[in-house]
A protein has these predicted regions:
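Radical SAM enzyme [4Fe-4S]-AdoMet core and its adjacent flexible, acidic
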Residues: 1, 132, 136, 140-142, ...
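Conserved alpha-helical substructure of the radical SAM core
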Residues: 2-136, 224-228
Length: 251
């Protein structure tokens, strides 16, 4: 008698082929993403910052020439078109040469993107990034109005990220997502954030919990309760059923 949980021959073969592909991938471990922390400086003072970034730090930005040599070395070993360079910080827009950096990455055949708080993302700066071949961007939104400003420590933060989202929606050639860090203050307003993003035309939204390091480690407002973690999961489940906006979830 066939066991109810047994696999068919076809499925067993497919599973074995998948396992072999995974074994090869683990052994080869091909490079697919390269993160460049191009600066430790930041123009905000976020409550949850894991690196305690500030406007002025004692560490100089990595020179573009140095990172260019890294890229040239990587290009000798792998296809640049298959390695996505993610420019992070600190806040990448603190660098006066950020567009030049992006152009240097793009000219070497690497697709690239940026993670930004959008405070310094003016239309002129955004155009310079487009001219430099930017492929993608992640911007942060942790609430509507004062909720976001409270999290980011700046009264202009919400206004600027609101404008940044509008600019990104108007340029569909740039893939982008919005990142929301859930905390005790904005937990009850996730539906408001969702409705705001849907009306804006946002297609990708990442909802994450705050990792308790850096400033977040000493801030009780960043520590979710077990019931709140469960509530996030229920919220994601319901939102996925609605289908209004795609989701990614990381806890």
């Amino acid at each position: 008698m066939k066991h109810p949980n047994s696999l068919s021959l076809r499925r067993r073969v497919a599973l074995e082929l998948w396992r072999k592909r995974m074994d090869i991938a683990v052994k080869e471990h091909p490079l697919r993403q390269l993160f460049w922390e191009c600066t430790q400086r930041c123009n905000l003072h976020c409550r949850h910052c894991g690196s305690d970034c500030r406007a002025e730090v004692g560490v100089a930005d990595m020179p573009l020439a140095d990172f260019s040599r890294v890229l040239d070395s990587v290009a000798l070993r792998t296809d640049p078109n298959r390695v996505f360079v993610v420019v992070t910080g600190g806040e990448p827009l603190m660098r006066h040469d950020i567009a030049e950096c992006g152009a240097a990455i793009y000219e070497r055949g690497f697709p690239w993107g940026m993670v930004t708080n959008a405070l310094a993302l003016t239309p002129l700066k955004f155009q310079s990034l487009l001219d430099a071949g930017i492929h993608s961007m992640t911007v942060s939104l942790d609430g509507i109005g004062d909720d976001h400003n409270w999290m980011r420590g700046n009264p202009d933060s919400f206004r600027m990220v609101d404008r940044a989202i509008d600019m990104l929606v108007a340029h569909p050639e740039v893939k982008f997502d919005v990142l929301t860090c859930v905390n005790r203050r904005n937990y009850g307003n996730l539906d408001d954030i969702k409705q705001f993003l849907v009306k804006k035309g946002v297609k990708q939204w990442r909802v994450v919990a705050v990792f308790p390091v850096g400033r977040a480690a000493a801030d009780p407002m960043m520590r979710l309760m077990p019931a709140e973690y469960r509530g996030i999961l229920d919220f994601i489940k319901q939102t996925r059923k609605e289908g209004a906006i795609p989701h990614q979830l990381r806890l």
